[in-house]
Amino acid sequence: MKNRLPADFLWGNSVSSMQTEGAWNEGGKGMSVYDIRQPAEFASDWKVATDSYHRYREDFDLMQDLGMNCYRFQIAWSRVCPDGDGEFNEQGIAFYHQFIDELLARGIEPMICLYHFDMPLSLAERYNGFTDRRVMDAFIRYGQKMIACYGDKVKYWLTFNEQNLYHSPEAFLISGYLQGEKTLRELYLIQHHVMMAHVHLTHYLHQTKPQCLMGGMLAHALVYPATCKPRDILCAQQLDEFLNQNLLRAYAGEGYSPEVMHFVAAEGFDDIYRPEDLALMATVKVDYLAFSYYASRTLNSDAIPPGTAVNNYMLFGNQDNPFLKATEWNWQIDPLGFRTIITRYYNDWRLPVFPIENGIGVIESWDGEHPIADDYRIAYHRDHINAMKAAIFEDGAQVIGYLGWGLIDILSSQGDMRKRYGVVYVNRENHDLKDLRRVPKKIYAWLKQVFRSNGEAM
C-alpha cells in the first residue's frame, strides 16, 4: 500500500508582520524598534514592506489558489498596544479580526505568532527590552489579551519566533536591547525572561482555551563536527545542548538542561532563575514542536578561543562543509539535515513536529515580462519535502504540516528586498517601491500541484 500523508496535513506559508505589513503609522499603530532603523545600500526601511496591511486579500487569494490550508502570521505588538504596556488599540485588534476572518473564509487555518523581534519602541527605550522583567510582564499581558481576543478562531499558537536565538549573540538584536555592553549575564536574563513569558502564556492558553495548541519554536541549523576529532564532536554536542536541547527539554516539561544550569551557577547567574519560575516551568508542556530550517552548519573546534562561552562558539568555529552546495549567502543546502531534525524531535520527545519555515533565498529581479525561472527553488522544496516524507514514512515521525517561508516575496530579516524566497514575485526594490505587483514565478505551478495533491504530485 502506498504511503500517503494525512488528509488534514497542513501546507502553507509563514511570515512576520514587519517584513510584510507596512502601514507603520496607520490604524493607531505605535512605533517599534524597526521603525527607527535606517535604510542602507542593501536594506530598505520598514515603512511599506510588501504592503500586506492593504493587500492581504489579494495575497490570500493567491494562497487559496495555490491550495494552501495554513498561514502562520505574526501580530505586531505595537499595532494592538502602541506603547507595549499601555492601552490596547481597538482599531488594531479589529484589523486582525478581519484578517483572520478572511483567512477562514478561504479555508486557510491561521497560526498566530506573538513576537518576531519587533519590540515596541517605548518598552525598548524605557526598559532595554527583555533584559527587564517588566517587559516580560508586559508581554504576558499582551499575549493574554490576544488569546482572549482570537482564541475562539485560531487553533495554533506560538509565543516567540525562533526562541533559541535568545541564547545566541543575536539576542541583543531581537529583544529590544538598545544600549549596554551585551554581557553574558544580560544574555541569560533575556533568554530566561523570554522563556518565562512563554511558560506563562502556554499555561494561560491551556487554562482558558483548552481547544487551542501552543507550540515551542527553534531556529534549528543542524551543526556537524568538522571532523571525527573528539573535541570537534564535544563542541558540536555542547552547542546543541545550550542552543537547542536546553529549550526542547523545557518545552517538554523537563525544565532547563542540567548542563546549562551548572554553567549558570558557576558563572554566578543562578539568582536570575527564581524558584517559583522553575516550579511553574516544570508544570507546563507544549503541544507541538516547531522549527525553522534553511541550512546546516559545521563547527571547527580549533578556531574557538579557550574560555569562549558555548553560546558564542559559532562566532569563531563556523566552517564551510565541502560535501554540501551553498546558496549565494553561503547557506549550506542540506535536505538530509532536515530529515534528521524531524526524526530526532519525535524520537526524543514524542510530540508532533511542525516545520514552519523552509525555503531558499536568492537574488532575483523581474524583467517586467517573463516569470522568474526559479528551477533551483523547485529543486530545494522538492528535496526538503521528500526528506520530510522520509522522516514520516521511513522513520515514523508524526508531522503536522509543512510551511514555506515568505512564499509571497517579503523583505529579508535584514530588510534586503534582493533576497527573495517567494513563489510569487513582489515588484519592488530596496529603494524603489514600483507598483508592488504580485507576479507568480515558475515554481508557482509546481507548488500548486504539490499542495493540491497533498504532496503526491512532486
Which residues make up each language-model segment?
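Glycine-rich, proline-tolerant flexible connector loops at the mouths of alpha/beta enzymes
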Residues: I75-F88
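A common structural microfeature
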Residues: D8-L10, Y53, C70
